[in-house]
């Protein structure tokens, strides 16, 4: 249950290593010393020594560079971060290794409480403070909907948050975890990158899209005040763009021989495909009609005032 363009590289590391391991035992033929001129040998040894010293120097610099400024509180211009130091500081654990260690990260315990308190399902959005989540309720199930063995319902839950690893390990496999920067969210991954943004974190999908694409209530008073009902309706309409549907079906539809061949044939096109993260602009890009607005646009008329 993993997805997103950015994550494929991490997920493929283990099988790639297994594929390359047999190649590592194939012997390489090295020229005999007698066949190498003395001057060439000196040059070869010197170049190897310089390269080794350069790697050692770089390693020493990297090991002693905090990467987030002297107080480890901000991402510097390099975009390189000492992740261990960051999470040690954020969780209060010198060596955070287990899922339980990351429950002390801001919002982590609160997300478990929010899921327990919404048995019919909900979309959870990170609130401005660190111990609560904003809840968008799921569309209520019918009265005769089946319940679990303990009599409780297990509605659709989606959590919209950046830190996927600690979240996924603690909420379990029945909770959908997506992010706004495209690490494991195909929709966010296909938005245009923000210029000069931190690499791998240079996209930012508005939460209105998460409401639009899920089985959640999409109107007031069920949505947080910082979301716009018209934006949600526009995002919902924009998801009907045929090209966007094709890209999303490539990763969401059931795998079959036909789907596999289609993904292979369209891989380059799907990878290049980008949407606009502003729903109104995305509708214009795709040539789709604008939904009827819920709230009439403000025009400043009639004029009021002295």
Describe the residue ranges of each PLM region.
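Signature aromatic-anchored transmembrane alpha helix within multi-pass, membrane-resident enzymes
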Residues: 29-69
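Hydrophobic/aromatic-rich transmembrane helices and adjacent perimembrane loops
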Residues: 4-39
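Phosphate/oxyanion-binding loops and surfaces in catalytic or ligand/nucleic-acid-binding neighborhoods
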Residues: 21-24, 60-64, 174
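C-terminal luminal/periplasmic domains and tails of membrane-associated envelope-modifying transferases
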Residues: 86-306
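Transmembrane helical bundles and short interhelical boundary loops of multi-pass, membrane-embedded
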Residues: 54-90
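Short catalytic/ligand-binding loop motif for oxyanion handling, primarily in non-cytosolic enzymes
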Residues: 5-9, 62-69, 168-170, 185-189
């Amino acid at each position: 249950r993993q997805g997103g363009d950015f994550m494929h590289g991490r997920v493929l590391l283990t099988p790639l290593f297994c594929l390359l391991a047999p190649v590592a035992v194939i012997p390489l033929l090295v020229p005999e010393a007698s066949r190498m001129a003395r001057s060439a040998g000196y040059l070869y040894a010197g170049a190897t020594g310089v390269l080794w010293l350069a790697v050692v120097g770089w390693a020493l610099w990297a090991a002693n560079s905090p990467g987030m400024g002297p107080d480890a509180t901000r991402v510097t211009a390099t975009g390189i971060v000492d992740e261990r130091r960051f999470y040690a500081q954020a969780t209060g654990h010198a060596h955070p290794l287990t899922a339980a260690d990351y429950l002390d990260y801001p919002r982590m315990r609160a997300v478990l409480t929010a899921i327990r308190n919404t048995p019919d399902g909900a979309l959870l959005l990170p609130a401005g403070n660190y111990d609560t989540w904003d809840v968008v309720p799921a569309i209520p199930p019918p009265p005769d909907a089946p319940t679990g063995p303990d009599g409780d319902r297990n509605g659709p839950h989606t959590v919209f948050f950046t830190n996927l690893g600690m979240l996924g390990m603690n909420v379990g496999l029945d909770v959908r975890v997506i992010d706004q920067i495209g690490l494991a969210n195909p929709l966010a991954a296909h938005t245009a990158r923000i210029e000069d943004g931190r690499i791998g974190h240079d996209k930012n999908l508005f939460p209105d899209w998460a409401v639009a694409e899920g089985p959640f209530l999409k109107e007031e008073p069920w949505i947080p005040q910082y979301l716009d009902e018209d934006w949600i309706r526009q995002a919902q309409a924009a998801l009907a763009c045929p090209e966007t549907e094709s890209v999303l079906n490539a990763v969401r539809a059931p795998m079959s021989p036909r789907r596999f061949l289609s993904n292979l044939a369209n891989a380059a096109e799907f990878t290049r495909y980008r949407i606009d993260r502003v729903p109104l602009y995305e509708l214009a890009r795709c040539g789709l009609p604008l939904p009827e607005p819920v709230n009439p646009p403000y025009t400043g008329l009639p004029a009021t005032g002295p």
